[in-house]
Amino acid sequence: MGNKKSSNPVDTAAKIAPLDNKAYEKALRKLHVELVKLQRWVVHKGLKVCIVFEGRDGAGKGGTIKAITERVSPRIFRVVALPSPTEREKSQLYFQRYIKHLPAAGEIVIFDRSWYNRAGVERVMGFCTPEEVQKFLDGAPMVERGMVESGIILLKYWLEVSPQEQERRLRDRIDDGRKIWKLSPMDIKSFNRWDEYTAARDAMFAATDTAWVPWFVARSEDKKRVRLNIITHLLSQIPYEALPVEPVTLPKRKIGKMKQTNFPFRFIPEKF
């Protein structure tokens, strides 16, 4: 896989002190500037970029994607998070509902979970047969080769979290009214199937970690660090240049000559 330092992505090095907010925000600000440069380069060159994020529930996929996209244009950076397939979609070619979301020239598409649902949740929760899983594992590398040959820059990230940290985060979702929406009935059903998900992950890596689209594993025990590490890594995987920016100045404008309206504006209560 992308990082060969450890054969076991759960294997964690010595404990590192959590990154404080000030250091995190400073580093993230610099990376956001680089993402804006990348954005302009992708449009300028007509590049097609697709980034896949996978990992267990609570691994930090959503927070990482938000950190990537919060300072760029949603017209260029497009996030795809598909719901469960409809009955019609279930009757289609498995990859079909994902293919229509792939990037056109000048776009960066980020999948918050992807076609790899078949290798993970669908396999573990019994939503597909073992034969369908194997067919997917055999076919995914060829589909991805086709994407690359069509000119798509495809990056695949797996966020790895320990069972202890996952449990802490899921309990936090239960206790925090701002996060309870993140906890689905499927998350609860999946909670006791850690080993099954581990086996599914290992089979997925073995079958789909290819020379043309390898898997990159990011340890996500520290949410702040994994966001910075992933953004830094993806910037290193897409060659780009800083395009010249024309200086911008605001023109002079005239205000005050228009007669003020008597319209009774309905202002909202100012409680803060």
Where are these regions (language model features)?
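Glycine-rich phosphate-binding loop of ATP-dependent small-molecule kinases
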Residues: M1-F272
